[in-house]
Amino acid sequence: MLSLGAFLALSLSFHLSQGVVASVLHRRANACKKLSRSYPNSTIHPGSSVFAEDVIEPWSQTCQTTPTCVFAPASAEEVAGGLAILRKADQTFAVRTQGHMPIPGAADISNGVLMVTTSLNSVQYADDSKSVVQIGAGNRWLDVYKVLAKDSLAVAGGRFGQVGVSGLLLGGGISYFNSDHGWGANSVVNYEVVLANGTVCAANAQQNSDLYWALKGGAFNFGIVTRFDLATFSVPYMWGGSAYYDASALDPLVNAYASYAVASGGSSDPAAHSDPSILYNVTTGEVSGYSIYMHRGDDPAPAALKNFTDIPSTFQDFRVGKTILGHENDTNPVNFGVGNRRQLFSSTALASSAEAVYLVNQTFFDVIAANPQIKTTTDLSVTNTYQLFTPGMIRAAETSGGDPIGLYDPLGNGVLAVLYGGNWADAKDDETIYKFFQDMIDELDNRAKKVGLYYDFVYLNDAAPTQTKDIFQKFSNGTALPKLREIAESYDPDQVFQTLTPGGFKFINSPA
């Protein structure tokens, strides 16, 4: 039995803890009110049509949440001011640019503040030379290409116009121009960043160079980037388009990619790009193929892609003379921006080789056959997409100054990243589908290890929810994480971006 003194001490401790909790809840309840008072034109409350547009219709229905309010700052200074209010209130929040990350919590939040950067939408050249374009963090790539196409210029930006600028670049960034320019992030010459203490700073090769390095793939762990300054380059002509294939063309498509994805193949041409997908509709059993092709220049029949263009297709729209804007408009999947589906990405990697290409395809169909339970799901489609990080891309990333991702070339053919993706209709199927994709990744990794082709890397922008914790352990062959943590501690000693923004990819969640 407790003594009277012990009882009184326990009672006091309980009431004190209750008081602390009540104080925190009170501060958080007032955060939206304070945002509204300070920034009435930038704060959106539940019930408004704008709130519904920003919140109720995410790209993936797996990310459907209800924040307490939405804060849409119109400048870096408003970001800093809003962040100060959230920090003082100890208020959890999420930051969304365009929200094409189908990981719950990465760009959405319940019972917290959702900061959206869509009002940071300027696109302008840094000076009359037009060698650098300054891009507000709230833009989609389509917005950027509309400006650049007028001058026959391009940047190492996203392949799909509906994708947001910020998320793609903070995760590295795959583009049509990777072989010449490395990751999209390797073309960033300056970041405008709001730090946890409210400072608006520049991060580039001369100023805050450690932060500059860390932001090239280190995700949302250091501050809120409000502007990206990217180097431009001339692309007056492009050949390319997209093609759709029926089941009879799938073996030739995989064979063509097996020839392409080696150093002696078409991928040795830095002007070429190809990333074919195999699609399987679980409901109908239909198998089909889709691919985007691009070749920089005005060659109407690029030799690097001949193995693909010789394959009979059900539809293709290849032509020459396109700007980056025209090419993107023609190849953007029709339903890419539709937000009425549940989406999942999952990713792994292999040392590129013809054997690796065949192994990925065989594993895809073997795991489908071994999991008949997926046929009970509602309207599920699954895809296998090949994405090659060529030797040229790896060299370009290194010569640009490097990045935390730190790819190396194990066999001289580059790194083959695999994206196994899915979309479906009903939340009741989530658990079944998540397990199915985890089984597929595990099976491919095991098979790759047995034949010496496993490459320990997950492309952050294509990761599954189950892959968020050890992403950074895989960077730079396991050596980047301590440095990233040190930089984060330097710029955010109170761990605002580790604890108040709980979703997504966090160093605090990564094993040592």
Swiss-Prot record:
Position of the signal peptide: 1-22
UniProt superkingdom: Eukaryota
PROSITE patterns per record: FAD_PCMH
Alphabetized GO MF terms: FAD binding; oxidoreductase activity
Keyword line: FAD, Flavoprotein, Glycoprotein, Oxidoreductase, Signal
EC nos: 1.-.-.-
Segments forming domain FAD-binding PCMH-type: 63-235
UniProt-annotated glycosylation sites, renumbered to this chain: 41, 197, 281, 307, 329, 361, 477
Induction note: Expression and the subsequent production of PR-toxin take place under static culture conditions (oxygen limited), whereas no expression of the PR-toxin genes occurs under the strongly aerated conditions required for optimal penicillin production. There is a negative control of the transcription of the PR-toxin genes by the penicillin biosynthesis gene product(s), or by a regulatory peptide encoded by a small ORF inside the penicillin gene cluster.
Pathway, per record: Sesquiterpene biosynthesis
Family: Belongs to the oxygen-dependent FAD-linked oxidoreductase family.
Function: FAD-dependent monooxygenase; part of the gene cluster that mediates the biosynthesis of PR-toxin, a bicyclic sesquiterpene belonging to the eremophilane class and acting as a mycotoxin. The first step of the pathway is catalyzed by the aristolochene synthase which performs the cyclization of trans,trans-farnesyl diphosphate (FPP) to the bicyclic sesquiterpene aristolochene. Following the formation of aristolochene, the non-oxygenated aristolochene is converted to the trioxygenated intermediate eremofortin B, via 7-epi-neopetasone.
Protein name: FAD-dependent monooxygenase prx3
Provenance organism: Penicillium rubens (strain ATCC 28089 / DSM 1075 / NRRL 1951 / Wisconsin 54-1255) (Penicillium chrysogenum)
Gene from which the chain derives: prx3
